Amino acid sequence: MLGMYVPDRFALKSSRVQDGMGLYTARRVRKGEKFGPFAGEKRMPEDLDENMDYRLMWEVRGSKGEVLYILDATNPRHSNWLRFVHEAPSQERKNLAAIQEGENIFYLAVDDIETDTELLIGYLDSDVEAEEEEQQALTMTKEGKVDHSKGQLAAGSKGHLGCEEDFACPQCESSFPSEEVLTEHLQSLHQKPTGEKEFKCENCGKKFPVRQALQRHFEQHRKACRGEARFVCKADSCGKRLKSKDALRRHQENVHTGDPKRKLICSVCNRKCTSVSSLQEHRKIHEIFDCQECMKKFISANQLKRHMITHSEKRPYNCEICNKSFKRLDQVGAHKVIHSEDKPYQCKLCGKGFAHRNVYKNHKKTHSEERPFQCDACKALFRTPFSLQRHLLIHNSERTFKCHHCDATFKRKDTLNVHVQVVHERHKKYRCELCNKAFVTPSVLRSHKKTHTGEKEKVCPYCGQKFASSGTLRVHIRSHTGERPYQCPYCEKGFSKNDGLKMHIRTHTREKPYQCSECSKAFSQKRGLDEHKRTHTGEKPFQCDVCDLAFSLKKMLIRHKMTHNPNRPMAECHFCHKKFTRNDYLKVHMDNIHGVADS
């Protein structure tokens, strides 16, 4: 998110209402203050799909209420700081409302907002009052008569964007000023009764399968009381009243004709269907399916079923290449691209290839020096809000994700998933036949094999040095550019690799997550634990090819081999003539064996 500007009167912090960053006041904001305009890409409604994040979009409407275009702030490059204002969980918690002026969207403070308060968007109270008036106009008295004392339907009420009736009901002709009011409308009017319950008219006793049908029936009684709808349909005990003879004729032709095709009409919205099966399928859209976990609503059982997977820990779909698991089948398809050799998007700076253009664009940001997002706790800078969010976890001492197989705990769920796959499920099934080392994916194995063959096809654009893998080349290039993108949050030290930063941070936190099961000794790195375990097993896998001596550590073998180099100057004990590769080893030997301290 390059060039993201946040005014001094506001600050970015972790949101209290949803994951990610939220916008907080740095000073008091008075009621009536206006901010904006909201920035985003202009899109047409038909260009949107269900996978997009609609929380970062606003409709811009014309003078007649028609949608001109959508302002989409999903792409950080085309948005501004208002994208960090989240929707209020309830109408009571809102402190901002969106209004439209011309073709611009502004955020209006609807209350005085104190310092260090998160800004939360809602809709104007006048919209709620208009909706309540509309509901009251349809209320029946206990005697079964229409109550005219509660007012008529609200006319000309404006939505939260300052335009009339922004949110249209997909099941009837009603429109509403906000999504929340529309949701209440769907629940109250289009929700089917549970069990044997039916919706009954208090005036005439007629029963209806859905509340909206009853509501339409109420309207007939109301119009009759006003002298409207003088033409009554008497077919099949229908009783529907219409305003004109032509309307009555059309109604009878569409609903009560003997033609089977004429009977394929939805009783809720009067939509015509071509077959019984299509009519049955259409009627499902008038059912509201509630998620009991998060209270989201869906218009089909299949949509609800797909949504429920997000609340489950089950990941039934596996990649057959690397065995990584996913909650949805479409996620597997998107993931498989990383295993493909076809990577048309190649970075000119580091040579790394990408299968997806958006991933390539995000990667190019890593070569930029701009870091507009700052951590309030340690002042560390980051290129993207996601990087900042991930960094904030190191300031949180809680390790909420616990492994069910062992006692290991983690701050991030993705780290836990990797731990389970590698340590407990042994997903490193791709094994090198030359050294027997195993890897999680075939692509990593292919890169590893180049270390055996000597193949080096990645060339440094600065010095011409060749490397076996793009990752090694990227790290090398940083030696030319001086780039150290991984900054320690506790000190000023920077690192060219993320692994180096992780190990360094443990020198500050004293964290030692790798514990020996034999003696409970703990280590900050897994390599340290592996080396320590050999003191219990007696294993010495590193053998000298000159004298057959074996060592538990590779560095000890390297030092030993120096003793076989005739050209290397050696430090020799003048008592026993034993040779040492380093003077400090000789000093220890003289002190321990011959009792001669260094003078």
Curated annotation (Swiss-Prot):
Enzyme class (EC, first level): transferase
SMART domains on file: SET, ZnF_C2H2
Gene3D superfamilies: Classic Zinc Finger (3.30.160.60), SET domain (2.170.270.10)
Transmembrane segments: none
Cellular component terms per the entry's GO annotation: nuclear body; nucleolus; nucleus
Disulfide bonds: none
Pfam families cross-referenced by the UniProt entry: PRDM2_PR, zf-C2H2, zf-C2H2_6, zf-met
PROSITE patterns the record matches: SET, ZINC_FINGER_C2H2_1, ZINC_FINGER_C2H2_2
Coiled coil: none
Zn finger spans (C2H2-type): 167-190, 199-221, 231-256, 264-286, 289-311, 317-339, 345-367, 373-395, 401-424, 430-452, 458-480, 486-508, 514-536, 542-564, 571-594
Key words of the record: Activator, Chromatin regulator, DNA-binding, Metal-binding, Methyltransferase, Nucleus, Repeat, Repressor, S-adenosyl-L-methionine, Transcription, Transcription regulation, Transferase, Zinc, Zinc-finger
Superkingdom classification of source: Eukaryota
InterPro entries for this protein: PRDM5_PR-SET (IPR044415), SET_dom (IPR001214), SET_dom_sf (IPR046341), Zinc_finger (IPR050331), Znf_C2H2_sf (IPR036236), Znf_C2H2_type (IPR013087), Znf_PRDM5-like (IPR017125)
EC number: 2.1.1.-
Record carries keyword DNA-binding: yes
Locations listed in the record: Nucleus
Matches recorded under PANTHER family: PR DOMAIN ZINC FINGER PROTEIN, PR DOMAIN ZINC FINGER PROTEIN 5
Quaternary structure (record): Interacts with EHMT2/G9A, GFI1 and HDAC1.
Functional summary from the UniProt entry: Sequence-specific DNA-binding transcription factor. Represses transcription at least in part by recruitment of the histone methyltransferase EHMT2/G9A and histone deacetylases such as HDAC1. Regulates hematopoiesis-associated protein-coding and microRNA (miRNA) genes. May regulate the expression of proteins involved in extracellular matrix development and maintenance, connective tissue components and molecules regulating cell migration and adhesion. May cause G2/M arrest and apoptosis in cancer cells.
Protein name, per record: PR domain zinc finger protein 5
